Amino acid sequence: PGDLEAGNLKDAGKRLPLVDRVVFRLEKEVLPLWTKFLQGYYDRSGENHGNTNSMFDQAFVVGPDGVEMSPDIADHGIQMDPDVKPGIYYYGFNMRDPVVGGYTEEKRKLRRALQIAFNVEEYLAIFRKGNGITAQNIIPPGIRGHLEGEAGVNPYTHEWIDGAPVRRSIDEAKQLLAEAGYPNGRDARTGEPLKLFIDVQSQAVDNTQMNWMDRIFGQIGVQIEYRPADWNRTREKLLTGNTQIYSYGWLADYPDPENFLFLLYSPEGPLNCKCDGSNNSNFESEEYDELFRQVRVTPPGPERDAMVARMVEIYRREAVWLYAYYPKDIYLSNPWVRNTKRHGISKATLKYINIDDEMRERKRAEWNNPVTWPLYAGALLIAGMILPGVTAYRRRQNATARRSDNN
């Protein structure tokens, strides 16, 4: 939808590829890559990712409608292509854990309280520069089964107010925590504070994020401790179920809800299959599993959509993941590049790119036209400084010569 209006179909029906040659150059630093892009020597800001995060403040401004190009970038005629990936990044609960796991109403309330407290919108604004969308659903945008608007809101964590999803209040989180047996973040039986452990890869978290987590969970009296480790150690913990909360992510292999719903299919749980399964939460639900088996063999249509919707509801009701978001990247292309729309799954898209060579050469000359007036101005300034000295020197020499003649 919208491709015709955006001009993405101008080259439809032409023989592929649309360009004869593609040249890749490896830049070791972001700054020279960015500078050359603005000078017109690179057609796009990046291929594997947008390369815009490091230069975000120069490239974008955050306006009332979200992230927009800065005036300088917009004046260049540069095209902005936001790309919401068909994927999901999340922190999941280990459903076998004695504290956060389990399927009683008290355990659900505990997990929901933690979900509400984790302000994903704030997290994305601070640590991802707004490049992400809060996940209300296990299925990302662009995949059948993902719903937008009020119909797509997770009612356990958000409300629909004035045409937008609004996170439920910290007071609600505190109430749920008390009903779960942890008033003010303390075990009602022992009085001990509730302390949770999050396993992450070492490079995926820094002190700023850990301090932020301490603050947001401190609002409901819950203590958090990160346990960073390399991927091999983290994977070993997942395989043995030796985690409480873990970080993970998934990008689509193919555009079907099955490719995400299987993340909670119990035979995929490492503790069930004794394998490298993808259900790292070790979530188990007979109803969910049966629906998943039916979804696998049912063709797309209303019947299958209803099954998928029911599975999404089970995921929400059981509060299997602490938080989730859909990753987003922003790609920039110079004005002579056509067909810049990204494909979320396929990487073989360079054959669709087209270039207006004449415009590229014209813009390069315009943007890199040498500015010579400072040289002339500098020369005049230097001449203006030297000329009085030369004149005075000559006068002095002439005066000395006249005195010599008189003697």
PLM features: what roles do these ranges have?
Residues 398-407:
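Cytoplasmic C-terminal tails of single-pass
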Residues 381-395:
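Alpha-helical transmembrane segments
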Residues 19-25, 192-202, 224-226:
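Short, well-ordered beta-strand elements
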Residues 275, 333-369:
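Long beta-strand-rich cores associated with HINT superfamily self-processing modules
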Residues 10, 25-97, 121, 125-127, ...:
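Extracellular/periplasmic solute-recognition and catalytic clefts
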Residues 1-23, 28-32, 170-171, 175-179, ...:
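Gly/Pro-rich hinge or "lid" segments in bacterial periplasmic/extracellular proteins
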Residues 100-101, 133-180, 201-208:
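Structural transition elements
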Residues 73-77, 84, 108-112, 116, ...:
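Extracytoplasmic/peripheral linker and loop segments enriched in polar/acidic and small residues
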